[in-house]
Structures are given as structure tokens and as C-alpha cells.
Amino acid sequence: MAQHSHETGGGQGFPLLTDLVSKDSAPLFVENLLRGEKPRAEWMCGVEFELFGYDRARSFERIDAEQVQRVLAGFAPSSNDIVHEGGAVVEVNDGQMNRLTVEPGGQVEFSGAPQRRLADVERELRRYLARLREVAESNRLTFLAVGFDPLRTIEEQRWFPKMRYEVMRPYLAARGRRAWDMMCRTCAVQSNLDYGPPADLAKKFLVGNRLAPVVTAIFANSPFEGGRPSGYKSTRAAAWLDTDAARAGLAPPALRDDFAPEDYVAYALDVPMIFVQRGGRYLGAVAGVRFREFLERGRGGLRPVFGDWADHLTTIFTDARLKQHVELRSADGNDLETSLALQALWKGLLYDPAALDEALRLAPRLKGADALVLRERVARDGLAAAHEIGRAHV
């Protein structure tokens, strides 16, 4: 799941993050993807759960960077479990193999350790939320589980001081009118699931993307913006519609019935880069350069290394994406019970072979333009969204 360190290579006989790569490295990237294959008996499930924090003492302003860091530090068993960047607390390990991190607008994200059973996912989420209530109460804070900030405008947002976001902020702003809304004013619940052989990986990726509008509709939970109705069932989904189409929405390879892992690598190679890391710094010298071009010619004196590929994959924001697991990213932030229902839905569809085959058969097979129309209608109307080939409801 998201916690697996080997996703970025470095295993026995496999490149280190610092190893150079070239225009001939596409097979290596495919091999790295396929290293996520696991036997069915070892399949696990993971959850990523985001929340907005508000300051009760300041008329429910969004919490600032100092408050976010206090919240994170409240989960650390010791100072050794705290990750700093430039003096700021940016990540905490809670002693149970779970991580807490921060999104660009100070949203707090719980990344759960992979679990065999949904009951164990529930146990860890309940433990996290119980502790969060204690930390919030001691700091006079309130946390809200919705898909879009219902109260504060983009001008009122507080940006968290993280180097990655400082590079992403201007890049994405130039490529989508609502990119900053996406970064600061959205929260999601994400499901992370394992896969078996390449054919199983392909089915899960296709279903995850093709059913994304249906899942968005079922779990739509963001009808407000600026303290009033926004006109959307999922304002979060609406924000994503105007955020860098080169890396968001329905993954183009999912339009292919003959999809194979090589197609995902080929797609990712043509997605423009945002940054690379060198010496603990995020460098935007590669911004806008397709990864394929970076492999061929480098950029600004920089030569591509294997770790650049791993970083690049984290900047692809499609409804379902691949690392060494499948990430399912189409649902609004929701409360505990609804978030657990989401996990059960995805696990039931993707881990039962008969259900997976039937889901693939029933999932909409849309052309690119039709898929965009469906996403727009789902954002506005949720389960009532109509499309000429059917309705986005179950």
C-alpha cells in the first residue's frame, strides 16, 4: 500500500533512487510497477482520510501552519517519530505504522497502514479520530469531514510551508482556474488496494477509472462553498474539472479495452513534470517538460535518476492511478461510517473475481469527450446525473 518503501526501487538487484536512467528505461519502469504483484492471500487494503481543521477561537478560520504542526506532534510517541522539513513538522508516525501528513492548505491526512481486514481499518480509524478529538479539544479546534471547504474563500486560505507545495503552487495555477481550490479547499477519502498478475492489475485500473464518476456521485459530500450552496453536489469534483487536464480526471489509458501496464508507463512518460529533488530541495527547472524528454536530454544540467520517476508518479492525479498498488481517488471526504462504506465497496468490487469481471462489463465505456461530460454532470447533479448511454446511479 502507500506505506511500502520498495515502491521507489532499491530492492536487491534493482536500481537505487539515485541511479541514472535514460530514454531506454521504460521497461525498467514497467518492471518496477509489476513488482507490486502479490498473491491473493497477501492482498491488503489501506485508507487515506483527509480532514479540514478550523479554529473555534477565531470564528472558524482554517487552522494555520503552527496549529497544524501542534496537531501532528500530538500523535508522535517520541521525537524520533516526527519528520521535519525546514524546521516545520511535516509528517508524524503514530507508533502503529500509520502516518499523518499535511496537504497544501493545512488539511490533515491520515494514511493508514495496510490491513488484512476492513475491521482493522475501522479500528485504526476510530483510534485516530478518538485521539484527534483529544488534541483538537485541547487546542480549541474543530475538524470537518467534507469534500470541499464550505466556509472559507480561496483568499482566506493558509498555505502550509512545504517545499513540494511551493513548487507546485505556481505551476498548477497556470494550468487550471481552480487548481488552488483543489490544493487548499478539497478533502478526499482514498482507497488503496493490491493487485495480482498484469491482467488483474489492468482490470482494477480500468474499473477504478471507469466507475469513478459513479463513486463520485454516490459519495458526493460537498454542496457548499463560501457559506452558501455552490450549485454542485460535489464542489470538490467541480474543482478537479478545472485543474491541469494533463494529469487529472479519467486516465486516458483507461479508455483502452486492451490496456496493459506498459500503457500506463507510456502515458506517464508524456505527462509534464513539475519538479525533481536534489540535495533535499525541490527544483522546478524541469517544470512543463515531459518525462520522456527529460530522459532523452536532461534539463538545466540535471540528469534523470530513478527517484525522479517515483516523484513524477506522485504528481499524476487521475481518478485511479498506479504505483505498486491501485489508488482509488474519486470520493469526497466523508465521515467515518461513510468512508468505511467506500472501502467496503471498492474492496468488494476489486477483490472478488466475479464482481470485478461484472463491474468491468457494466462500467461505462466512454470516449474522452463523453467522459468529461459525465464528470461535469456528476459534479453538478450527483446521482441524478444523466448521460445518453445511461444514468450514473446504481
Predicted regions located by residue number:
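Long, well-ordered mid-to-C-terminal structural blocks that present hydrophobic/aromatic surfaces
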Residues: 283-370
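Conserved small/polar residues in nucleotide/adenosyl-binding loops
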Residues: 392-394
